[in-house]
Regions:
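A compositional/biophysical signature of low hydrophobicity enriched in polar/charged and small residues
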Residues: 1-167
Length: 167
């Protein structure tokens, strides 16, 4: 989402206090803030987005990606370890456009990169979304430029670097 300049920290704090929002971060990239919304139902997610997030006056635009959750390549145990490791200082979300019908091939390739803590095929403007974590920025940079962007079937990608100062 994009917001009024200077309101990022306030909005992130507000978003993190909303039931159903599991994390929000400021980013460097095309968008100012990225949030993860979780609910047992699709209607629950829609309500959080349309009735809560989009009603915040300082938020100027939103873009929603919906996870497909069709394949379980990132196992729960790995996610638990990722959560424990999740205090890595360098983090980013990477959104990816793939060649037509190659989303799951890309997802399978991503599952072999240890620094990718979460990834899924998404519905929306992009095809795949992944969260990358590393202990330092240079490692994160190498994973994105030499690991992710070099994979076959990727047409374009956009990186949203998480800004920890706004958390």
């Amino acid at each position: 989402m994009n917001c009024n300049l200077g309101f990022e920290k306030k909005i992130i704090s507000l978003l993190n206090s909303i039931d159903g929002i599991t994390e929000s971060h400021g980013t460097l990239g095309l968008y100012d803030i990225v949030s993860k919304v979780d609910s047992d139902t699709e209607k629950g997610i829609q309500d959080i987005i349309t009735s809560t997030i989009r009603k915040i006056p300082e938020i100027k635009s939103t873009m929603t990606l919906t996870r497909s959750e069709c394949e379980d390549l990132f196992k729960p145990a790995e996610k638990l370890i990722a959560a424990m490791i999740g205090k890595n200082s360098a983090q980013a979300y990477v959104v990816i456009h793939t060649e037509r019908e190659k989303e799951y091939d890309v997802l399978r390739h991503l599952s072999h990169i240890p620094e990718i803590k979460e990834a899924d095929v998404v519905f929306g403007y992009y095809d795949v979304l992944c969260k990358v974590e590393a202990s330092e920025y240079t490692t994160l940079e190498k994973v994105i430029t030499k690991g992710i962007r070099k994979l076959s079937h990727i047409q374009t990608s956009m990186t949203l670097h998480i800004i920890t100062e706004q958390d």
